[in-house]
Amino acid sequence: MSKYWSNITKDIEPYVCGEQPKNKKIIKLNTNENPYPPSPKVLQAIKNAAKDDLRLYPDPNCDVLRKTIANYYNLSKEEVFIGNGSDEVLSLSFLTFFNPEETIVFSDISYSFYPVYANLYKLDYKLAKLREDFSIDIEDFKNARGGAVITNPNAPTGLYLSLDSIKQILEDNINKVVMVDEAYIDFGGESSVSLIKDYPNLLVIQTLSKSRSLAGMRIGFALGQKELIEGLNRIKNSFNSYTIDRISSLAAIEAIKDEEYFKECTLKVIKTRNWTINELGKIGFKIIPSKANFIFITHDTYEAEDIFIKLRDENVLVRYFNKDRISNYLRVSIGSKEEMEIFIDKIKKIINKL
């Protein structure tokens, strides 16, 4: 700790991201990345973008990308906001729509960046306790004084909340913003985007990191009625007008446009997820129903931390959370079929020795 730090810097507990190993031989199932490369059209766009106009600033409004996303979701360009990954979009959204004197609500088991944002911006928040099966009780989100944040599908559980439940939360908080974080929506859930026209308090946040294989380029976006997007732009332009560079913008456009490749990759992930769930069930694991590109697993006989350590020793990384209620669970990202076959083989050998 330095005497030059501000009080906020001294007090804040930063988010801890998943391990990014340098060893390329490690099977990486800990950060929910896509096991398949970006679309070939994306890679070609990146090559084509490497030219002398990189000396110029990019379009601060990302107009072409916004129009591409708007067309994809049948929205107007004015209903799309672009940011440097969905983490930045979420952070700016917390600052744009939530007030320090009004308590916001999000689940006790959810994306662990939410309390970091709340503490950074001095926001009061209430943790809505998930049920024993990790499902959401929507009554806990009723009449939230400051607004609400829903992760759908939830992370790290993978559970999906129906659109009817989302509608109820929106109606119960009609005078406050409800953010729906849909980072994993493309792996089996139904997006809330269709509700935007009817709910001026709905902000849907998505990313190209997961289903579009662009985690390395940091592209996220928010979708909502234009008054919400105008507010986000006011805050963004008080920090950094140029959040997306030229190359990332062009890559994102091609990723959105290549629907055939997108569907092919997401279908492979879903099929591999279902295969993995079946194989783990054969050896006694309990798996929370998942609509994401990861699964949340536990075993009545073996400790999650022990399995986590043994897998790491075998060069397989998964995510372990040493937290209340989930300390005996592992979150396992869905890799390629070949990677998951190795994972299953390793975990069988490990539990046979424990």
Curated annotation (Swiss-Prot):
Gene3D superfamilies registered for this protein in UniProt: Aspartate Aminotransferase, domain 1 (3.90.1150.10), Type I PLP-dependent aspartate aminotransferase-like (Major domain) (3.40.640.10)
Catalytic activity, EC: 2.6.1.9
Keyword tags: Amino-acid biosynthesis, Aminotransferase, Histidine biosynthesis, Pyridoxal phosphate, Transferase
Cofactor(s) the protein needs: pyridoxal 5'-phosphate
Biological process per Gene Ontology, one example term: L-histidine biosynthetic process
Coiled coil, from the record: none
Pathway membership, UniProt: Amino-acid biosynthesis; L-histidine biosynthesis; L-histidine from 5-phospho-alpha-D-ribose 1-diphosphate: step 7/9
InterPro entries (alphabetical): Aminotrans_II_pyridoxalP_BS, Aminotransferase_I/II_large, HisP_aminotrans, HistidinolP_aminotransfase, PyrdxlP-dep_Trfase, PyrdxlP-dep_Trfase_major, PyrdxlP-dep_Trfase_small
Protein's UniProt keywords contain Membrane: no
Residue positions, PTM N6-(pyridoxal phosphate)lysine: 210
Reaction equations catalysed: L-histidinol phosphate + 2-oxoglutarate = 3-(imidazol-4-yl)-2-oxopropyl phosphate + L-glutamate
SUPFAM superfamilies: PLP-dependent transferases (SSF53383)
Enzyme class (EC, first level): transferase
GO MF annotations in UniProt: histidinol-phosphate transaminase activity; pyridoxal phosphate binding
Record flagged with keyword Ubl conjugation: no
Record family assignment: Belongs to the class-II pyridoxal-phosphate-dependent aminotransferase family. Histidinol-phosphate aminotransferase subfamily.
Oligomer status and interactors: Homodimer.
Record's protein name: Histidinol-phosphate aminotransferase
Organism (species): Clostridium botulinum (strain Langeland / NCTC 10281 / Type F)
Gene for this chain: hisC
